[in-house]
């Protein structure tokens, strides 16, 4: 009876995947773990604080900050889907993940990645409307339009996750079940399949092109028009204000699209599994740390709102 149960448990365990993690081959695993944990806490605190500020401060109830709060929410979810499992696994020594857990991780990762790409396009259109169409801005970017744009971003991201996750998880994995990543990422998982996935890889590549092409067109068109208007401005102060309004967003666009292009569109023969893991760590851990810093330190409205909130809290304590 016990023997039968043990066999059943071994068979069940054999279906689990093993995540390599960031610390597997490192000689300074403890130091790397500490740095990752601190970055995780910084990202959680920074994005949560940014969301709290935007929703509690009436002066920040504008379309631009509404989109920034959604970006911060996506970054928070990104972190919570991928990083805690890796950190806990390093402490407990259990780096395994079940197929269902792997599928859930992959679905949320694809959903959030897709939604964030479209959200950046919506933010670029918002900047175009603010800089190039200031008189029509209240009409073009009213509350209903902003809510519809954000809802569309989430829906399109979910479509991406619902399309790719079931197909990826349906492939047989009869070779090593060791995923060379710290979370269940589609390219890393496909390398474990013992069936021919060349057609699916091509379809995934085309899907990525479609997912990235529309946002890239919107973003590039918006900023081309903005730069054209800035070039025609006579006022140096007006130029600086317009550039400051858009520069923060452009930094985030370059970071995310660069990482997405590298991971999903560059041929796998041009990069190693270790390089893939570093890029994944960059846009999963480092970018959520940078986003609040970029949008707060470079933004007088946010810093003013933060000082106001801290002063009100101090007055309440007195």
From Swiss-Prot:
Q: Which Gene3D superfamilies match?
A: Rhodopsin 7-helix transmembrane proteins
Query: One GO BP annotation here?
Result: detection of chemical stimulus involved in sensory perception of smell
Q: Where are the transmembrane segments?
A: 31-54, 63-84, 106-125, 145-163, 201-224, 242-264, 278-297
Topology in the lipid bilayer: Multi-pass membrane protein
Identify the glycosylated residues.
5, 10
Q: Which residues lie on this side of the membrane: Extracellular?
A: 1-30, 85-105, 164-200, 265-277
Question: What highest taxon heads this organism's lineage?
Answer: Eukaryota
For this UniProt record, give its keywords in alphabetical order, as a comma-separated list.
Answer: Cell membrane, Disulfide bond, G-protein coupled receptor, Glycoprotein, Membrane, Olfaction, Receptor, Sensory transduction, Transducer, Transmembrane, Transmembrane helix
Instruction: Quote any Pfam family the record assigns.
Output: 7tm_4
Subcellular location(s) of the protein: Cell membrane
**Keyword Disulfide bond appears in the UniProt entry:** yes
Single GO MF annotation:
olfactory receptor activity
Residue intervals on the Cytoplasmic side: 55-62, 126-144, 225-241, 298-318
What Gene Ontology cellular-component terms does the record carry? plasma membrane
Q: What is its main location?
A: membrane
Q: What job does this protein perform?
A: Odorant receptor.
Entry's family note:
Belongs to the G-protein coupled receptor 1 family.
Q: What is this protein called?
A: Olfactory receptor 2T34
The species this protein belongs to is Homo sapiens (Human)
């Amino acid at each position: 009876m016990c023997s039968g149960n043990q066999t059943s448990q071994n068979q069940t365990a054999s279906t689990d995947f093993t995540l390599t993690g960031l610390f597997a081959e490192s000689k300074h695993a403890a130091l790397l773990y500490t740095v990752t944990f601190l970055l995780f806490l910084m990202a959680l605190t920074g994005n949560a604080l940014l969301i709290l500020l935007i929703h509690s401060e009436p002066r920040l109830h504008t379309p631009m900050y509404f989109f920034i709060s959604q970006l911060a929410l996506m970054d928070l979810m990104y972190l919570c889907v991928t990083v805690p499992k890796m950190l806990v696994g390093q402490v407990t020594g259990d780096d395994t993940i079940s197929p269902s857990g792997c599928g859930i991780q992959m679905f949320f990762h694809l959903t959030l990645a897709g939604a964030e790409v479209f959200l950046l396009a919506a933010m670029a259109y918002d900047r175009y409307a603010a800089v190039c169409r200031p008189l029509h801005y209240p009409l073009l970017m009213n509350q209903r339009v902003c809510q519809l744009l954000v809802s569309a971003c989430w829906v399109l991201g979910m479509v991406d996750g619902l399309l790719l996750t079931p197909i990826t998880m349906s492939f047989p994995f009869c070779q090593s079940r060791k995923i060379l990543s710290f979370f269940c990422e589609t390219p890393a998982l496909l390398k474990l399949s013992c069936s021919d996935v060349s057609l699916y890889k091509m379809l995934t590549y085309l899907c990525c092109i479609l997912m990235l092409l529309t946002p890239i067109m919107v973003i590039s068109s918006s900023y081309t028009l903005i730069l054209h208007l800035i070039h025609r401005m006579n006022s140096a102060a007006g130029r600086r204000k317009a550039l400051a309004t858009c520069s923060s967003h452009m930094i985030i666009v370059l970071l995310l699209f660069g990482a997405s292009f590298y991971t999903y569109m560059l041929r796998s023969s041009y990069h190693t599994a270790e390089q893939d893991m570093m890029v994944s760590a960059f846009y999963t851990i480092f970018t959520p740390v940078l986003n609040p810093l970029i949008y707060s330190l470079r933004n007088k409205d946010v810093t003013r709102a933060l000082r106001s909130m801290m002063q009100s809290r101090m007055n309440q304590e007195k």
